[in-house]
Amino acid sequence: MTKSYERLVQRLMAAGRYKEAEKWLKEGLRDIGEKWPGIGAGLRDQLRQMRILEQNWPVVAALQVEVFVRHPARQAFMECKKASDRAGVWPQVRESLLRYLEKGELPWQQKGWPLPASGLDRPDVDQRNRFPLVGDLIGIAILEEKPDQVLKWYDHRPKGHFGFFEIGEDAIATAVQAHAPERAVAIWKNQAERLIAQVQPRAYQEAVKYLRKAGEVMSTRKQQAEWDQYLESLRKAHARKRRLMEILDGLQGKPIMKKRR
């Protein structure tokens, strides 16, 4: 039966008995933290709450970095930023987190690491990971609005790999369309063509969304003629797909954006 360490720690914290709470928290981590990852995460978060009450921002940041190493994600990255900003060390921490995602080097083992030990056992590198963690690097580049880095890591993706966990190619194209409109158009076209290749009416409807996005960008770049030529090439390549022809009829020969009066 799972021991109720989280409830005990919460009661002790509510009573202001923080030393006892920390003692039982660490006991719980030693006892069941690895067997029950969810409980372990809850106990570590309770320690983070204690350090926040103490306004011990360097340790709060160190704990948050450990969360990020265990489960890299954009939200965890932002939590690292919040705590590290309070500690006045975000630029160094940011570089170390990105280096971890790229090289697999644990942040606290890197030269010049600015944060203290958290007081808990630090996680090891997950051996299932294959660095660089391209999806996470793309996600953070989108978060930081760095389209050049989005493209850098998008181009680093494994061949034939079209999905990045929760990050879709539509989000990638949207993130880079102002910086590199031709790349955004190419991504949307590729998405549409892969959907068309499924030879399913539902996929055609999905494809048209990406075709419209590509067409809008081409129109703003005064490439309406090229857009029409592209649609005509699709018609010739897929002339037997009647439902697709109907959809393309709704696109071809019509400006994607209304002309200004």
For each of these PLM feature ranges, what is it?
Residues M1-R261:
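Eukaryote-biased, non-catalytic alpha-solenoid scaffold regions
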